[in-house]
Amino acid sequence: MGSIHLSPLSDLALELARAGALRDFVETGTYVGGALGWAARAFERVWTVEINPEFQRQAKANNPAAANVSYLLGDSASELPKIMGELKGPALFWLDAHAGAGYFADHDICPLVAELETVLASPFEHCILVDDARAFLAPPPPPFDYRKWPSLDQIFAAVANRPGYNIVAIADVLIIVPDRHRHLVAQFCFAIRPKI
């Protein structure tokens, strides 16, 4: 599991934010708000979507000082279009709304393709980080229902609908950025990957 708010991934996120003038942060899958304090300090505006009311309650309790955070309760595939209408420029997206097999949800939920299609339909050049890449690089094992999770080719097809984007899988994260930021991702990969 990646942690957007911890180094080295947070370093990449902040470098992308600087290079791309990303003032806004959008998270799907709030859980209990572990990344919200970091995001509230690093970005002007923050949106977070959580489907579980108890997790959202805990996230709010864990981040009482985060005044620039907007909390949305519901399915990210339905809530994300509302956020897209609020954006005035490119944003950093942390997509982590997938769950299942009794982990964070009773049944498998994986809105990733719908999320990608929504974000990439925007006229802005957003940067996207997707947590838990291992669940997409190969079918998730039982007790997950792999049929509810997109295959890697489905993810690539969603990204390919928006020409000019690059996708990399490293450190359990899918990194999807405009080609002009590819060098930043390459430097991140060079720094953290094992030698070949």
Question: What role is predicted for each listed range?
Answer:
Residues 1-92, 98-196:
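A short alpha-helical cap/connector motif
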